[in-house]
Amino acid sequence: MKKGLLFIASILISLFLLSAVAPKQGNDPWIVPEKYEKMKNPFEANKESISIGKSLYSQHCKSCHGKEGLGDGPKAAQLDTPSGDFTTKEFQAQSDGAIFYKTREGRDDMPSFKKKIADEEDVWHVVNYVKTLED
């Protein structure tokens, strides 16, 4: 009986320790539906759009993604998953529709902005702004 309890306890401890070092979900590829991958931004990336996007970014995104979009905002260190760096070639290579989808839907520590930025037009302006943050 003691051996059985000892065995079960060691299994539970092992599972607990493994879960502590397992990779976080944010390392998984973020799958964007094809509909959004192909979606075109209906707003030209002009001064007005970028200015609106920058204002919204400062209000809703800067605390995690940082002033320059490097993923180094004051809240980034508290997150379980890395905050995205918008200046990378990988990020900038994404379609506008993919960025729109990720902003609206969120995942893991990245919240959905469907309610905070309810107007889809405003999300497109944020997309135009973050596309200016390339390295």
Give a label for each model feature.
Residues L18-D28:
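Bacterial Sec-dependent signal peptides at the C-terminal "C-region" and cleavage site
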Residues K102-D108, K114-D135:
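C-terminal capping alpha-helices of c-type cytochrome domains
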Residues K47-L70, A76, R104-E105:
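Sequence/structural segment immediately N-terminal to covalent heme-attachment motifs in c-type
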Residues M1-G4:
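Positively charged n-region of N-terminal signal peptides that target proteins for export
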Residues G26-L56:
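Electrostatic cytochrome c docking/interface patches
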Residues S51-Q59, G84, G97, Y101, ...:
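Solvent-exposed, polar/charged alpha-helical surfaces in well-ordered, non-transmembrane soluble domains
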Residues P82-G97, F113-V123:
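Electron-transfer interface patches adjacent to heme c in soluble/periplasmic c-type cytochromes
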Residues A9-F16:
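Bacterial N-terminal signal peptides
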